C-alpha cells in the first residue's frame, strides 16, 4: 500500500535525523479542499492502525491545511522545536504562504495535485529550506511518486530545478 511505503520512508528519515534532534516532516499534497479532508481522514485512520497511537496523538502529529482548515493557526508553530507535527496534508495551491524548515518528504497524492511547474516550484520550495542549526551535508528531500506518472512529474521537477539553477545570485 502507498501509505505503508510513505510511512516506511518517514521512519527511515526519522532515523537519519536523530543526530540532528529533528522530527521528520512529510507533506502530502492534494488537489482540492474536499480531497484534502478525505485523504486526511483516511490517512489518520491508517496511522492509528499502523502505529497504535491514540486519536489525540495522531491529531497532534497531523495538520490539515487549506483555506478554511481549523488547523491553520497551528501551522505557525511547526518550526518550533517542541512541535509534535510530523505530517501536513495540504491543498496544492494555497493563497497564503507558509515556511516550514524541516520538510524531508513530499507526497503528491494524485498527479493533478502536482502537474504544473508553478505548483512544483511552490511545493519544492517548501521542502528545500534547510532547518535552523543544520550542520553537515545538505539534507535530502524525497518526492514520492506513483509509477504511472512518475516520469511526467520527474520531467517537470527537472525543468523547475534547471530554471532555478540559472537564476543568478548576488551578495
PLM regions and their residue ranges:
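Helicase-associated low-complexity regulatory tails and linkers flanking the ATPase motor
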Residues: 1-25, 31-86, 102, 112-171
